[in-house]
Amino acid sequence: MVVLRSSLELHNHSAASATGSLDLSSDFLSLEHIGRRRLRSAGAAQKKPAATTAKAGDGSSVKEVETYHRTRALRSLRKDAQNSSDSSFEKNVEITEQLANGRHFTRQLARQQADKKKEEHREDKVIPVTRSLRARNIVQSTEHLHEDNGDVEVRRSCRIRSRYSGVNQSMLFDKLITNTAEAVLQKMDDMKKMRRQRMRELEDLGVFNETEESNLNMYTRGKQKDIQRTDEETTDNQEGSVESSEEGEDQEHEDDGEDEDDEDDDDDDDDDDDDDDEDDEDEEDGEEENQKRYYLRQRKATVYYQAPLEKPRHQRKPNIFYSGPASPARPRYRLSSAGPRSPYCKRMNRRRHAIHSSDSTSSSSSEDEQHFERRRKRSRNRAINRCLPLNFRKDELKGIYKDRMKIGASLADVDPMQLDSSVRFDSVGGLSNHIAALKEMVVFPLLYPEVFEKFKIQPPRGCLFYGPPGTGKTLVARALANECSQGDKRVAFFMRKGADCLSKWVGESERQLRLLFDQAYQMRPSIIFFDEIDGLAPVRSSRQDQIHSSIVSTLLALMDGLDSRGEIVVIGATNRLDSIDPALRRPGRFDREFLFSLPDKEARKEILKIHTRDWNPKPLDTFLEELAENCVGYCGADIKSICAEAALCALRRRYPQIYTTSEKLQLDLSSINISAKDFEVAMQKMIPASQRAVTSPGQALSTVVKPLLQNTVDKILEALQRVFPHAEFRTNKTLDSDISCPLLESDLAYSDDDVPSVYENGLSQKSSHKAKDNFNFLHLNRNACYQPMSFRPRILIVGEPGFGQGSHLAPAVIHALEKFTVYTLDIPVLFGVSTTSPEETCAQVIREAKRTAPSIVYVPHIHVWWEIVGPTLKATFTTLLQNIPSFAPVLLLATSDKPHSALPEEVQELFIRDYGEIFNVQLPDKEERTKFFEDLILKQAAKPPISKKKAVLQALEVLPVAPPPEPRSLTAEEVKRLEEQEEDTFRELRIFLRNVTHRLAIDKRFRVFTKPVDPDEVPDYVTVIKQPMDLSSVISKIDLHKYLTVKDYLRDIDLICSNALEYNPDRDPGDRLIRHRACALRDTAYAIIKEELDEDFEQLCEEIQESRKKRGCSSSKYAPSYYHVMPKQNSTLVGDKRSDPEQNEKLKTPSTPVACSTPAQLKRKIRKKSNWYLGTIKKRRKISQAKDDSQNAIDHKIESDTEETQDTSVDHNETGNTGESSVEENEKQQNASESKLELRNNSNTCNIENELEDSRKTTACTELRDKIACNGDASSSQIIHISDENEGKEMCVLRMTRARRSQVEQQQLITVEKALAILSQPTPSLVVDHERLKNLLKTVVKKSQNYNIFQLENLYAVISQCIYRHRKDHDKTSLIQKMEQEVENFSCSR
């Protein structure tokens, strides 16, 4: 500190009033440390009375002394003009450091310091290494001044005593003001520079973290302390000395600012009170040291960087939200190992995260980087918290999920890929061609590399899957990944979703792509599968964001750039082929493109077989074929969903009780049978994925109109095969196809025709002559033997209005040709989209049909279509049709309600009658109409009402609650491996507990608890404390594997504390000290465990303990043998030596340790326990004497056995040779007592059984009723028959039903009264006049002779409504009358 001084004249008491104005400003001018000012004020208060007495006694002596000191001061001023500065600064620093240890200043301490200040200045001259040359000059000036003054010391004062006294007053006063400003500015610069230096050192040492401070040796710790103290002496930021080696370092880093501020505030208050006392002591100080200006400062000594110690692996449990220090300038320090602190010290840790350190010397770029890292960590923590499950708390997550949450498991490069290993190629149906092509790309290069080496070719390295959703694109990728994981040559499989590689950071997406391909190249052969690749590589355009363009460019370069990607197969999947950048769709990148279309009939059947192959019993092939035929437009995912929904329908139908309870009930799985009705319900609920957005025009004939129009559909298909031979190729494909080897279907590739050789050495002379005569090797023209051919295929279905050509026939034909791609060009398609013109829509549809040939263009109601559209669209349509190549397999299918001759000429030119392109629909004949109405009138009208008794019986069935599932029995190898893992966990627990106990034992405060209490010193300790415990006994129990959880350990720590509090009263100071230390021991142990123990580890130990208890595994199995050594027997005779093998076995087993603090227990007489204690109190009953005697004998036997058990257990505890823990002994004793209590209870059950004889008889009806309900096939007549025959037991049945009433009503399915009413109703007989129904059928067929399809459907609906109204009638007479009346009154005018 720089201290400004007044003139060197002596204090003149008479001039005190004249210096009032300057005295008031002394606080501002004085920059001296407050501790020094307090010391001088204390000295002034002590010497003031003496000075006053001397002054009053002899005034001349005062003048002489004043003259003497003025002379000496002037001489010193002229001699040391070059060294005038603050000579008292170093002395103030030394005194401040010496007084900092005390923290509390008193008058007595101030006097003692004032008396010894000369010796302290001469002996304790500390010159910091970081002081400048100016500080050394100060010390030299101080020594020279002491030599000149002799034993008269120049006292310093921070005040200007007199305004007019002194030598050359104007010069001194001017220099005073100048030096004041310079000194203040200089001191401010020094303090800022010191703070910056210290911040840099803390940043360099910031890597020291928590446990490293405790691991430093004495030399390193002292060296760091000297370096830090050097900076502290030159600044005013440290006042306290280090009390201990560990606590001092934490104080220097954490408590500097707070202690300094508090102490400065206190000293400022004391300074105002001691102003008057300082006047008498500070009057002798001179002011010649303020005459010299401040010159250039010296640079500080360079502090070289010291490499930090390597961070130890063991550290305290990681925090979820803060993985490291919040700021590099404020590192975190943990509790020291020797003296653990209170958990209240965490307050500074919490505040530290809110403090942002700033370093003015660091560059702006480093600050920005640190600020960015902090913001990124905070944003990641918030994102992680948002991703947590809503019904899970942070402490409920398992350790592995916590670890993934800490490292940011949502990143693409660290997220593991989980695959279903059960999906193989045999789990994929209807895609055999795609699977064979994938084998060529991946499997064959590994199995047959010599083939590719011979021709120096590379197999295709990329393929693109495209098609509608749910057609098996991702499924094939999963199957490929699992197939590549089998065998010796495994293929690495990388899977990335569409947006996994996208990131908001510039360049991060490209970096992840490069890392992905680099990793795949290092692990080659490998496969990279991009699911939904349209989100990663969309079409590049000028209006698109530049980021996506950069990603697409990077992907293009990685797939086929200057550097070959080697054995890396890239597979992409999308359902939007037009959204992918066209540069990807070329050989070298995506060599092959596989269309995953909707499965046909055979593919659907194969998919159904795959999903039902594990059912028991398996469904019939005929049923699966019929089901596949009705699942038109269903993709593979839809079929899988139908199978699952059918199984749920069967479960709902068989056991409706499970939907009303949350408990698991016992079910008979063999009684759950899936029927065709379940599939019907599932198909009614299920809407195919392809029909949710756009409805497909193809639709099979419904079961109602199928007898009426099936023949017509067959005729249309025959006519279509003549015009469009590809239809026969598709429909009859299943007749001669080989599904196991689909590649053999190509007749051209596998034909037996002799073809000329293309090799040089394979040509014969004839062939060479032919080659010279321009012989053609390639026949690229169409061959009629290998491919069907058609010329502009077109067909028009013509009929009268109402014949069903547009509503039934054309959709049925399209359904039969379901393998072809169908494009609808009707009026809603043309005018439904407002963004495009009809002409543009028409052109796009026809171009797509041409591109995907063979295909179908469907134009329904072409007579209306041609009248509505304009001439531009007509010209566009006809032009595009003419531009299609002549032999292109693009079929034009149209329907019309007008005859061909009534159509416009342009339409008539499109469809030529002579080519068979026109099909006229005829009315149904008599046979077709008879089949149409036969099922409705003869079968459905005569069907009896549906009986609900079977459903009621199933609803009344009360299912018992299922017991919890038993765990799978482990094999011997699995048990051994499990025990090894558990022992590894317990080994870590024991190491941790030993460390905690060692830290408690080496603490001097807890030394009294390290050893057991000596019974010789305190004989009454045994009588007061029943269970002594100390830290040495705790260590012994740790060695013997007695602690399976930390709770057991803390229980013994609590026992040590409770024993100390119980034995030591709160009266004597020594006893109170022990009580305080016992409480401190307990709190310290809890604090250490709370700070360093992971809660997941404690939960794991508890689970292992519970598992071992259930398995009956002893914890002492792995305890060390021979832990207790027998004492040496020097005088033992040979005959006294034991040779019993049983004794040797006892010595090998680990015995229970006897705690050192546990004294030898005195043998007492075991008091007989009462019956209440044993839990065998008998109920007083009036029974026979024989039973009473036998019961008494059993009671005596139980009591005697219990006493023997207690005696043996006491002997065990006294000898200390038991091989199991005390917990296990208690469990064994409890089990023994429980077994005897069971014997007693069994003897009492005979009376209870006698009392329940009557109730057993009354349950016979209930058992019979339950058996009927469980069968489910028993008819209601059987139940009524039982109740009629057993009239005497009718009350029994009703009474048992009332007993089950609460259970049935809890299911909330049906009320008991309603169920009993349904079951008690008799089943009336069915009355049907079949002759009248046959006559009605003939009448209907005759009347509907000239009806078209719509009129026949209308009549069918009228008859169906009559049947529905009378569905509950058993007498069908009224139904027949109503149907006859409706048929007679039916009119076809509509």
Curated annotation (Swiss-Prot):
GO terms for molecular function: ATP binding; ATP hydrolysis activity; chromatin binding; histone binding. Residues 42-57 have a biased composition (Low complexity). It catalyses: ATP + H2O = ADP + phosphate + H(+). Gene3D superfamilies: 1.10.8.60, Bromodomain-like, P-loop containing nucleotide triphosphate hydrolases. Residues 970-994, 1086-1112 form a coiled coil. Residues 223-232, 1135-1148, 1185-1200 have a biased composition (Basic and acidic residues). Residues 980-1092 form the Bromo domain. It comes from the Eukaryota. GO terms for cellular component: extracellular exosome; nucleoplasm; nucleus. Keywords: Activator, ATP-binding, Bromodomain, Coiled coil, Hydrolase, Isopeptide bond, Nucleotide-binding, Nucleus, Phosphoprotein, Transcription, Transcription regulation, Ubl conjugation. The modification Phosphothreonine is found at T1149, T1152, T1176, T1323. ATP binds at G467, P468, P469, G470, T471, G472, K473, T474. Its EC number is 3.6.1.-. Disulfide bonds: none annotated. The keyword Transcription applies. Induction: Up-regulated in breast, uterus, colon, ovary, and stomach tumors. Induced in breast cancer cells overexpressing NCOA3 or treated with estrogen. Down-regulated in 5-fluorouracil-resistant derivatives of the colon cancer cell line HCT 116. The modification Phosphoserine is found at residues 60-61, 165, 170, 327, 337, 342, 410, 746, 751, 1139, 1200, 1233, 1235, 1243, 1302. GO terms for biological process: nucleosome assembly; nucleosome disassembly; positive regulation of DNA-templated transcription; transcription initiation-coupled chromatin remodeling. Residues 40-63, 216-380, 1124-1163, 1181-1242 are annotated as: Disordered. May be a transcriptional coactivator of the nuclear receptor ESR1 required to induce the expression of a subset of estradiol target genes, such as CCND1, MYC and E2F1. May play a role in the recruitment or occupancy of CREBBP at some ESR1 target gene promoters. May be required for histone hyperacetylation. Involved in the estrogen-induced cell proliferation and cell cycle progression of breast cancer cells. Belongs to the AAA ATPase family. Interacts with ESR1 and NCOA3 and these interactions are enhanced by estradiol. Interacts with acetylated lysine residues on histone H1.4, H2A, H2B and H3 (in vitro). This is ATPase family AAA domain-containing protein 2.
